[in-house]
Structure formats: C-alpha cells, structure tokens
Amino acid sequence: MPQLVPFFFVNQVVFAFIVLTVLIYAFSKYILPRLLRTYISRIYINKL
C-alpha cells in the first residue's frame, strides 16, 4: 500500500495540509462572507 510508505505518507500529509489551508482561506475570504451577507439580508427582509 503506497499510503504506508514513508515518502508517500509525507507527500500526502503535506498535500493535505496545503489543500486544507487553501480551502480555509478561500472559504473565509470569498465564500462565507457572501453566504453571510445573503443570510443577514434575508433575516432583515423577513423582519420588515
């Protein structure tokens, strides 16, 4: 199994760390603010 070979394991850990970092950055910078803005505007419209 290539997952248990140390070189591949280190490669997978590094790649997973990079992917998670990019995903967290993208969500916090672009995706979540849009969803939050939409959510807040819907709440505001419903309370009118």
From Swiss-Prot:
Q: What is this entry's stated membrane topology?
A: Single-pass membrane protein
Per UniProt, subcellular location reads as:
Mitochondrion membrane
Q: One Gene Ontology cellular component annotation?
A: proton-transporting ATP synthase complex
GO BP annotation list: proton motive force-driven ATP synthesis
Please name the InterPro entries in this protein's record.
Answer: ATP_synth_su8_fun
Q: Where do transmembrane segments lie in this chain?
A: 4-24
Where mainly located? mitochondrion
| UniProt-listed Pfam families | Fun_ATP-synt_8
What are this entry's molecular-function GO terms?
Answer: proton transmembrane transporter activity
Tell me which UniProt keywords the record has, alphabetically. ATP synthesis, CF(0), Hydrogen ion transport, Ion transport, Membrane, Mitochondrion, Transmembrane, Transmembrane helix, Transport
**Described function:** Mitochondrial membrane ATP synthase (F(1)F(0) ATP synthase or Complex V) produces ATP from ADP in the presence of a proton gradient across the membrane which is generated by electron transport complexes of the respiratory chain. F-type ATPases consist of two structural domains, F(1) - containing the extramembraneous catalytic core and F(0) - containing the membrane proton channel, linked together by a central stalk and a peripheral stalk. During catalysis, ATP synthesis in the catalytic domain of F(1) is coupled via a rotary mechanism of the central stalk subunits to proton translocation.
* Family of this protein: Belongs to the ATPase protein 8 family.
Oligomeric and partner information: F-type ATPases have 2 components, CF(1) - the catalytic core - and CF(0) - the membrane proton channel.
What protein does this entry describe? Answer: ATP synthase protein 8
- Recall the taxonomic lineage recorded for the source organism: Eukaryota, Fungi, Dikarya, Ascomycota, Pezizomycotina
